[in-house]
From Swiss-Prot:
GO annotation, cellular component aspect: mitochondrion
Organism this protein belongs to: Saccharomyces cerevisiae (strain ATCC 204508 / S288c)
The keyword Lipoprotein is assigned to this record: no
Task performed by this protein: Responsible for conferring a stable 5'-end on cytochrome b mRNA.
Official protein name in the record: Cytochrome B pre-mRNA-processing protein 1
Amino acid sequence: MFLPRLVRYRTERFIKMVPTRTLRRINHSSRDPIQKQVLALIKANANLNDNDKLKIRKYWSDMADYKSLRKQENSLLESSILHEVKIEDFISFINRTKTSSMTTRGIYRRECLYQCKKNLDLVNQVVSQVSSVRHQKPLTTQLDTMRWCVDDAIGTGDIVMAADLFLLYYRLFTDDKKLDEQYAKKIISVLAYPNPLHDHVHLVKYLQLNSLFESITGGGIKLTRFQLETLSNKALGLSNEAPQLCKAILNKLMNINYSLTNDLKLRDDQVLLAYKSIDENYRRGNVASVYSIWNKIKEHYVSISAHDSRIIYKVFKICTHNRAYRSICSEMFWQLTPEYYCNNPLILPAIIDFITKQDSLTMAKELMQNINRYTLPENHHIVWLNKRCLSSLLRMHLKFNDSNGVDRVLKQITTNFRALSQENYQAIIIHLFKTQNLDHIAKAVKLLDTIPPGQAMLAYGSIINEVVDWKLASKVKFTDNLMALVNDLLTKAHDFDPDHRNSLWNVVSALYIKKLCHYKKRDGKFVANAKKDIDLAKLLYINAAKRSKTYWTKSNCNPFIASSPCDVKLKVNNQNRFTILRNIALSALQIGRTDIFLWACAELYQNGMTIEELKLDWNFILKHQIRNSEFKTNKEIIQDIKKHGVSAVKRYLR
């Protein structure tokens, strides 16, 4: 299955280590075993070139595979070059080249580890002659040796090597089950310091150290608040370059062990870290991640109203706009007290928008009663009469055909703000379109002509969305004439925004892919072009994603009328990437194009979705029994997906 291979590829890329296949391709000038070739390098006492360094790395790779050495009945000590070389030659080579070569510094440190179990005298002889400390205290145990190697590496700024030496020690000596947490924390402290050129490698090393502790002790390394904060900031700094690594780090940090006796505020810091992660995934449109993280932290406080209102708002907004996740909005609405949301100018409009999308008249009546009952007099102007709240109320009254409410809100808007906003125009125009009455549509178009393009861009996007939906539903009497309207709107939008910076163009690109991927069945079979269109959707996405700059003109601003696929130009960025890929993947799954489905999942993975989030997302989208279930924890969700999940998703995303 390709997703695990993808994980390996990206990890290898982040560590920037030489892949095993490269080590195998080393063109050795000698047929001697690699150990003898390294010995020859040391005896020659010459400077190391790149090919020499590859030989040394191959030797290290062989030595780390201690199980293979045992099968060959060779001891670790006998396989070590320090066992074969004259100590004088070894020390001479090390002291001459160690200042300029990190590889040289790696040689003597690793050789000390190889020898430390059975030949501490030799180790001390090496340490006394290469150490920068004048009066080095003799090492008495193999653990002392590991600690000296780590300290020596940190002292010369070889931070990644310090982590590698720690990991190597416990790989070589598997009988030592008591992990040195003190030194692990010491290494993590230096890994946590900002180092832009190596931040990604440092974070991978943290994951490897933490994984070692999880495998042996059952729990990760306990961190201080400083380590938690610096590692999280490092990860967030790589959110664009390496979203999957960022996600892995944040997930670990949100679930690390902490001690109440040592740091009472660490758990609160983890909640703040979860907020940062929600914020990052909200920005990317990764609703599955936002849902999962919120589910982890929602019960941290006695009441969810104790959480940061900005986070509650973002959870409401992203889940409202993704139909499959609206159950969490319903849960939050009933858990929040009316006294809280009726006096919160950020949360109240989000709740109104959710109820409008949910089309629940019962909830709308409950909300309006609560607003009248619980809004404090001093908050009335701040909450009720702010622009966002009035826009949300206008949409709600339009949704439920409350003409009196619409008139009242419009009067308040014009009284307080003198003119309608683009959100207000959008709400009125799209309401007229949704009636599917030709007279009302004509009124909407007439109103649209009176609005400057800068105020009408939101309405343009909503109209095009509506027309595309009608087209997909084969409502010919509307779409035949209105496709000309779409072209007119996009031409006006291009004249106003020739560089296509407005979010309208993100919407247009996503809608074009949605239309392209839509399939129809005739007599139980897919129409002939369904599979070709899904290939075209993939090609258009790839071309748009890799294109650094597009030169927009009137001839390419409307993809819906392009005469050839070559003429279609789309805009793909973090604002619409997830929507486009999910549409492609969903259609591919439904028409049996497993290859395209897996490709789209791989793209989503590379842009920050974990395999667990992909499974959650597809099960929520495809299976109403799962999305409508009431889950208390993420563990319950995982168990339910394992038991009742979509079989195709189980089969493909293993």
